[in-house]
Design a protein with these regions (language model features):
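Asp-based, Mg2+/Mn2+-dependent phosphohydrolase catalytic module
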Residues: 2-32, 42-43, 47-62, 66-169
Length: 169
């Protein structure tokens, strides 16, 4: 019932992902959400985000930001990291996930999406057919519509955790 929303992987933070291992597994394109995935909502790129994208470029990844925000927000975040981006993405629509892969020159088999929301980020990636990693939100302060979605996400994540326990038995 809820499995269409289950992430492929679920980790505590973008910053704990083993990107070298992803590269070894054959992934070449990384698509990122911004707010509460890389920085707190509305924040500019911080030193940690800048260092991450420097590292990802050195590994050999193509990177693209995909955000439901308007261009000024995305452009402000992207200025110090200088990767491709898609704004006003209408996630979970698949159109701009595909556009991000087209920009990077990757496809469903070698792209990974990283985001903090099940009903926009993960569901859009799953509908597009790409691997996805759900991360816990960086900061608890969020817009009201996101707060409401978080309650529903807790229900889905409960069933996700139960499904993982059943697999281990």
């Amino acid at each position: 019932m809820f499995d269409r929303f289950f992430p492929d992987r679920y980790v505590s933070s973008t910053y704990v992902i083993d990107f070298e291992k992803l590269y070894e597994e054959g992934y070449r394109g990384l698509i990122f959400d911004i707010d509460n995935t890389l920085v707190p909502h509305g924040a500019p790129a911080d030193a940690r985000a800048i260092a991450l994208f420097d590292r990802l470029k050195k590994i050999g990844f193509k990177c693209c930001l995909i955000s439901n925000n308007q261009e000024p927000r995305v452009k402000m975040f992207n200025e110090p990291i200088q990767v491709d981006y898609v704004y006003n993405a209408h996630k979970p629509s698949t159109k701009n996930y595909r556009k991000a892969m087209e920009i990077m020159g990757t496809d469903e088999t070698n792209s990974v999406f990283i985001g903090d929301q099940l009903f926009t980020d993960v569901w859009g990636a799953k509908r597009t057919g790409i691997s996805n990693i759900l991360v816990k939100p960086i900061h608890p302060k969020e817009e009201i519509q996101i707060v409401l979605k978080r309650y529903l996400e807790k229900i889905v994540l409960y069933f996700y955790a139960r499904s993982k326990k059943q697999v281990k038995k």
